[in-house]
Amino acid sequence: MKKVLALALIAPLLISCSGKKPDSNGEEYIKDTNGFDILMGQFAHNIENIWGINEVLIAGPKDYVKYSDRYLTRSHINFETGQITIETIATLNPAETLRQAIVTTLLMGDDPSSIDLYSDANDIKPSREPFLYGQVLDNTGQPIRWSGRANSFADYLLQNKLMKRTSGLHVIYSVTIQLVPNHLDKRAHKYLDMVRRASERYGVDESLILAIMQTESSFNPYAVSRSDALGLMQVMQHTAGKDVFVSKGKWGTPSRSYLFDPEKNIDTGTAYLAILQNTYLGGIQNTTSRRYAVITAYNGGAGSVLRIFSSDKGQAVNIINQMSPGDVYEALTQRHPSAESRRYLYKVNNTQKNYRRIR
């Protein structure tokens, strides 16, 4: 089975923030999306040629994947399972190649806009506090901040944890590092102040923002999707991003570097939640019913939510207002045409309960 994390060369199909449809003025969007599809196709083909058909691995919403060394070496962080895998098919001194990749990964900074995940460029810059600081402990149980400790840990891994396997014509050398058990909480806490500012600015419950961030990206600031949704809240430039810019009186759409900035991404994603909450779905009177609709719309679009109840938007709102929140939830999780959106409401609603105690 192909080891593909985030490759699906299909244009989005629904208006949403993290989902799948061009806006009504979609010519620019389609052109941009087609360009991204071409880039992804070329990149995947390149990886397949180098690593083999069963070893295609590409960055996704919850997976950081960075290639180096002429694409012969890669670092993969699965932010959902909490596992780092660093591997190489280099034939000349693979241990030293792995050591350099281990150190680079452990010390990388937290600026996603500076890293090109679709090249083998050596563009990962260290910082005073690495992004993984506190999420990885070395063999002595200590967090890793500086080069000396990172190199010592790399040497330990190569001496004690080096693995070798064969795939096709390649021998793959690798090491695996486990993140600490509470790695998700540690990443979430990095963004709490940003979430609280956005919550206050737009009147959106911070527990909802956090639940969407966890569901969308597992708090991976490098997150990218097959439809080119970006960052922590998986914002799409030409749909949600454009709506937010219009609401702020700004021209155009947010750039990729803009959306890879964690604070700007959280601000944009939260502003879009506010648009859904107060404008597109603002006529829904019951706050719980409206929250269910907003969550589903963040994934699949407000139009698809309302069409469950009626093809007429005003009539759809009237029907929702005559229903209990439980009946609205049941309709959204059972009758929405997208299985992904049906699951999305279930996931976010359950996850939000875990964050309601955070203040």
UniProtKB/Swiss-Prot annotation:
It is an enzyme of class 4 (lyase). This is Membrane-bound lytic murein transglycosylase C. It comes from the Bacteria. PANTHER family: MEMBRANE-BOUND LYTIC MUREIN TRANSGLYCOSYLASE C, SOLUBLE LYTIC MUREIN TRANSGLYCOSYLASE-RELATED. Its EC number is 4.2.2.n1. Keywords: Cell outer membrane, Cell wall biogenesis/degradation, Lipoprotein, Lyase, Membrane, Palmitate, Signal. The keyword Lipoprotein applies. GO terms for cellular component: cell outer membrane. It is found in: Cell outer membrane. Murein-degrading enzyme. May play a role in recycling of muropeptides during cell elongation and/or cell division. The keyword Aminoacyl-tRNA synthetase does not apply. A lipid is attached at C17 (N-palmitoyl cysteine). Pfam families: Mltc_N, SLT. Coiled coil: none annotated. It catalyses: Exolytic cleavage of the (1->4)-beta-glycosidic linkage between N-acetylmuramic acid (MurNAc) and N-acetylglucosamine (GlcNAc) residues in peptidoglycan, from either the reducing or the non-reducing ends of the peptidoglycan chains, with concomitant formation of a 1,6-anhydrobond in the MurNAc residue. PROSITE patterns: PROKAR_LIPOPROTEIN (PS51257), TRANSGLYCOSYLASE (PS00922). Residues 1-16 form the signal peptide.
